[in-house]
């Protein structure tokens, strides 16, 4: 049996987190405190310190806010200058930043709560500008979708997916979340979506961030939503919901072009349609022969999918391929659920949980900024690596803080010399 020696030195297994903490402080602390305001003048924690503490939970492999107190505090507090707050302080800060929900009534008289969390949404955009992930004056591609979050909180409502929860509308540019507005889980996806999108677009435009192309699913295919989206972007690409008036036109079409997209054979065509009176748009039609050979009562031997757009120049294939890229955004929701705490909401009410959703979205955006700056190949990582891989390959390294010649030095016990460069460059 091997001999064991117990050493009482203050070693930490999370040596990689300290350079990330310093980078967070350098890039975002001023932006966070200027946007949210100072939380205290003398004693206590600023919002930037609270958000940094929450970031450490997920970048050290934690799964809930309480992990910062129960598991991580003794390690994070080893940093000689940067303070880490407790889980209770984070939870109090969430309550302080909570924005009152707005209640809307539908035509049928039913009430639905929305939470816009304007200040936190502004911070989300400002943080992306501070890290350089978005630049003022440039145009970007924009995606919008609703994510159904399963939870049994006090005010959770039954969704059409047969579970209790919320259904926040989430706006994405590239791989970054740029806006979140939470809603009751039983809210129809089109209900007040125009107002939600308009607030998000105006928030981006106030920071001189403009939208070139917008992609959305059939939940956004209504006249008022399309009119508003068209006013804020160059081109839109929206999945058209099927209706009987389209079928007559589609069945009469000739000149279908056979193409192969991602190894699957489709036939493409496009026509001009007047879906709403006096408003003609291009309808790109994609059809695929049914594999089972069964005939559908409406569509016959094919399955039809349509994209409504105001792009009259791009080829049908280019439009279909561009729209299909929207499916990759589902990875973001999977990442948020499993890596950044969306599957473990901390509070009992929607308004407070909306603040948490936005906090963790900011942390994920920052994580993506780190992956862009980091020489990932030196640590066996990729720019698209999940947070779990990042924890194993970068964060989990033994380290010890020592003081020598009146300076604090971090000793990292690793044969990977790449760690030495983190504090020598603008990364650490």
State the predicted function of each range.
Residues 1, 31-34, 72, 298-303, ...:
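Short acidic (Asp/Glu) and glycine-rich catalytic loops that position anionic groups and cofactors
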Residues 189-247:
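Domain-level cores of phosphate- or acyl-group-handling catalytic modules
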Residues 147-149, 176, 183-185, 243, ...:
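Short, glycine-/Ser/Thr-/acidic-enriched flexible segments
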Residues 1-163, 169-186, 193-207, 396-428:
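Dynamic "connector" segments at or just before major functional cores
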Residues 343-374, 378-406:
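Basic, amphipathic alpha-helical segments enriched in Lys/Arg and hydrophobic/aromatic residues
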Residues 53-54, 68, 86-90, 140-148, ...:
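Short, conserved catalytic/metal-binding motifs centered on acidic residues
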Residues 235-338, 424-428:
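An anionic, glycine-rich sequence signature occurring as long contiguous blocks
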Residues 68, 259, 316-350, 355, ...:
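Short amphipathic alpha-helical "interface-anchor" segments enriched in bulky aromatics
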């Amino acid at each position: 049996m091997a001999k064991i020696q117990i050493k009482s030195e203050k070693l930490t297994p999370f040596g990689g987190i300290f350079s990330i903490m310093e980078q967070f402080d350098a890039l975002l602390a001023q932006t966070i405190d200027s946007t949210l305001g100072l939380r205290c003048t003398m004693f206590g924690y600023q919002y930037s310190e609270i958000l940094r503490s929450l970031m450490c939970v997920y970048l050290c492999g934690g799964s809930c806010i309480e992990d910062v107190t129960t598991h991580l505090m003794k390690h994070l507090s080893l940093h000689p200058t940067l303070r880490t707050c407790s889980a209770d302080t984070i939870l109090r800060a969430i309550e302080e930043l909570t924005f009152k929900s707005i209640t809307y009534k539908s035509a049928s008289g039913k009430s639905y709560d929305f939470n816009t969390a304007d200040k936190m949404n502004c911070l989300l955009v400002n943080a992306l500008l501070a890290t350089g992930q978005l630049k003022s004056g440039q145009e970007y591609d924009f995606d919008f979708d609703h994510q159904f979050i399963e939870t049994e909180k006090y005010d959770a409502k039954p969704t059409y997916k047969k579970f209790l929860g919320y259904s926040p509308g989430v706006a994405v540019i590239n791989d970054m979340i740029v806006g979140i507005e939470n809603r009751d889980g039983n809210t129809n996806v089109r209900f007040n979506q125009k107002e939600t999108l308009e607030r998000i677009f105006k928030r981006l435009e106030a920071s001189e961030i403009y939208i070139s192309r917008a992609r959305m699913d059939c939940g956004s295919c209504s006249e008022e939503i399309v009119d508003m989206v068209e006013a804020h972007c160059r081109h839109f690409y929206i999945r058209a919901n099927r209706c009987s008036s389209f079928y007559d036109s589609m069945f009469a079409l000739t000149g279908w072009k056979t193409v192969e997209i991602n190894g699957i054979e489709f036939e493409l065509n496009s026509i001009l349609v007047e879906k709403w009176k006096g408003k003609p748009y291009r309808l790109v039609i994609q059809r695929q022969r049914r594999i089972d050979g069964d005939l559908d009562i409406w569509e016959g031997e094919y399955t039809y999918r349509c994209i409504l757009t105001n792009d009259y120049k791009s080829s049908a294939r280019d439009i279909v391929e561009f729209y299909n890229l929207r499916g990759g955004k589902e990875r973001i929701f999977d990442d948020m659920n499993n890596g950044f705490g969306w599957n473990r909401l901390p509070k009992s009410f929607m308004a407070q949980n909306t603040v948490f959703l936005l906090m963790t979205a900011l942390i994920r955006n920052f994580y993506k900024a780190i992956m862009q700056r980091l020489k990932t190949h030196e640590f066996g990582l990729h720019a698209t690596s999940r947070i779990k891989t990042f924890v194993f390959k970068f964060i989990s390294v033994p380290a010890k803080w020592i003081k020598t010649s009146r300076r604090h030095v971090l000793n990292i016990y690793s044969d990977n010399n790449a760690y030495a460069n983190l504090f020598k460059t603008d990364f650490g």
